[in-house]
Amino acid sequence: MAEVLLFEALRQGLQEEMDRDPRVMVMGEDVGHYGGSYKVTKGFAERYGDLRLLDTPIAENSFTGMAIGAAMTGLRPVVEGMNMGFLLLAFNQIANNAGMLHYTSGGNFTIPIVIRGPGGVGRQLGAEHSQRLESYFQSVPGLQMVACSTPYNAKGLIKSAIRSDNPIILFEHVLLYNLKEDLAEEEYLVCLEKAEVVRPGNDITILTYSRMRHNVLQATKSLVYKGYDPEIIDIVSLKPFDLGTIGASVCKTHKVLIVEECMRTGGIGATLRAAIMEHFFDYLDAPILCLSSQDVPTPYSSPLEELTVIQPNQIIQVVEQLCEN
């Protein structure tokens, strides 16, 4: 066992897959000799050379399209978006090419591409660098989406994503890169379609992912002290949802709270709430509540920035409200 930071876990997983499979390559802005904006690819330029680690111009549409073409012709590219907000510049390539080409080619092409990078509200990164784009890509047919929240699942997810023949977006949160965890030296994978039951409980199901997992766990300390027994599930897979794990919890607790950093209007929480209502309505004893970020651009001011995202005290209040009714 060795203590590893989340960005180091991503690096380990990526390195293991590049060592295992010579078809795996990385491209993006500053991923080469600089080592990536958050040092996930540090040392890779010397280890793998310029053919497998490609520094690109600042042109997301161009290098994302190039990566999709590389995937169509047999490579397994990993694209690093320096910031998830910049992927809007490549939305056409991701939506109309990566997501659809397997279908529109009649199955003649697979697109084994991984698109990864940091997003979410950081510390005064400003509106354009604090984007949460999960729901933008959720509606694209053919894409899979996962979100890491710990060093353990970050490493396992990136390895599984690289081995998949589907186009996958791996969402990483900018504030979690320095999160520490002891990881075993043995190889492991994390299922791309499976939610994680972080804490079993009986009173209420709390569904969350990414950074909000840690806000929920912080709130849970106070909730347990007050006598509540929440079940916490990190949904991990943002598309498709693991309705088996989620449904089993809903049928047990009969109450659901969704906690996300995505925007309230059209966010992941809204889609997840609709899915639960469709499949498990008869098991609910109360309305599903969803705590989401405010529908505003993220302010630069630190106090205002904090007000736009969900805090542990808000989670405590809503759990008490649901459990007392």
Swiss-Prot record:
Annotated keywords: Chloroplast, Metal-binding, Oxidoreductase, Plastid, Potassium, Pyruvate, Thiamine pyrophosphate
Gene Ontology CC annotations of this record: chloroplast
UniProt keyword Lipid metabolism present: no
Protein's cellular compartments: Plastid, Chloroplast
Cofactor: thiamine diphosphate
GO molecular function: metal ion binding; pyruvate dehydrogenase (acetyl-transferring) activity
Alphabetical list of CDD domains matching this protein: TPP_PYR_E1-PDHc-beta_like
Its EC number(s): 1.2.4.1
Keyword Signal: no
InterPro entries registered for this protein in UniProt: THDP-binding, Transketo_C/PFOR_II, Transketolase-like_Pyr-bd, Transketolase_C
Pfam families from the UniProt entry: Transket_pyr, Transketolase_C
Binding site for thiamine diphosphate: 60
Residues that hold K(+) according to the record: 113, 161-162, 166
Catalytic reactions of this protein: N(6)-[(R)-lipoyl]-L-lysyl-[protein] + pyruvate + H(+) = N(6)-[(R)-S(8)-acetyldihydrolipoyl]-L-lysyl-[protein] + CO2
Quaternary context: Heterodimer of an alpha and a beta chain.
PANTHER family with a match to the protein in the record: PYRUVATE DEHYDROGENASE E1 COMPONENT BETA SUBUNIT, PYRUVATE DEHYDROGENASE E1 COMPONENT SUBUNIT BETA
Role of this protein: The pyruvate dehydrogenase complex catalyzes the overall conversion of pyruvate to acetyl-CoA and CO(2). It contains multiple copies of three enzymatic components: pyruvate dehydrogenase (E1), dihydrolipoamide acetyltransferase (E2) and lipoamide dehydrogenase (E3).
NCBIfam families found in the cross-reference section: PRK09212.1 (NF006667)
Protein name: Pyruvate dehydrogenase E1 component subunit beta
Name of the gene this protein is made from: pdhB
